[in-house]
């Protein structure tokens, strides 16, 4: 659910109907490509819950128009709430739907909501919360529901037109009165990240027509389900009223350098001290809990968007591709500069978050952009035949050639970066291709041993480069054309500090040379 102040800036919408690609030299060891699926009109939708089985995709909830309105007269209009359960068969690109109106009102209303949290466990899709119209209470609210849907049985019911009610079970618990958060599961436990409880008719600027309470929590619990009886137990709560005050974010699967699994919470809105997104990520796993990493600022793709995670098992590095959405900074591929827009507009930027085995972060914008201002509340659907870990992180080193890793589905399409009237729900599916660059992977494998830390990154007035190598090291700061702007040689272990206050915003390179080996890392300068 987006809550932001807008001004109008008019730019033409540009659709790409051919394959486009990009790779950042010496940084991202793979190429990304996007191409539209040529099919008949597909359902328009965003902010839905999702599951897949074989070639079929299951969609529940969400909205069928674009960005919600900002007055009490047009915000989250009931007529644009998805009133059907939809199935798309990707083998033929045909689709089917069943109306929710056949269900009891108390069951159907939570399934018409926006920004439910959801996760899959075995044969079931579990949905929590969501914001929408409560027909019984005659008002808008966030629902306190947990719904279990048998995925295969529901898909068959929708496709063949048989009753859907037998495949739905629902219980109430106030812990689930959340929307705009994220839900994950691991080893039989579920985790409900952040979000908020919103009730009433939304308006901006705020009026006394609604109440809003942020969760400020990661809720840990167990779902007990024998296929007939549904319950929850073992709730524990991790609370942080400053760093967990987030919603409408991405929570992505990650593989740690030691091979264990976890999640990372990326950005989200809104900070308590201003109407701006959070920029620092939060790493979380069931064993170690939550670790806020304030050493890094995620400047791009700050709102819920499609994302694809990959892991390099040799370099022990996570790559997370973020597709479009809304950003505090926009990337200009011509000037190679980042441009601040405090209104956090819709963007077409695609970036890659890189988290290496030393803990160092960077965010690299690609020359490739989305086909228009889209990506917000879009879903990345993985290709289940791609070599992946059990948490759906792609095994980068096992890819060979050009690989279809998944699809981009749904989301909001905007005509202008800021302004809500001209937007709609996306009805085009895009294929996403990844081609590993074996040359760059080999170059990465030959990088000098030892840790190189660059902080802060993004930087403003100065940047520090720290290495643990005891010997001759040459450290240089290069511009986008490869020209040396700063350089220093050192012969003992100590920090090198470059003054960057006179540099323009943009993407630079830190080059570390040890003997015949060269390591390069991107540095982002912001103002």
Task: Identify the residue ranges that each predicted region occupies.
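C-terminal outer-membrane/trafficking sorting elements
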Residues: 21, 25, 445-455, 459-527
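Blade-edge beta-strand/turn elements of extracellular beta-propeller
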Residues: 27-38, 93-106, 154-174, 221-242, ...
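Beta-strand-rich domains and repeat architectures in extracellular enzymes and scaffolds
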Residues: 36-80
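Beta-propeller and closely related beta-sheet repeat lectin domains
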Residues: 46-50, 112-118, 179-183, 247-252, ...
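Beta-propeller blade signature
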Residues: 74-94, 139-157, 205-227, 277-289, ...
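Blade-loop segments of beta-propeller domains
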Residues: 75-122, 132-134
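Asp-box/WD-like beta-propeller blade repeats and closely related beta-sheet repeat scaffolds
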Residues: 108-115, 132-186
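Loop/turn-rich, solvent-exposed surfaces of beta-rich toroidal or solenoidal domains
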Residues: 301-395
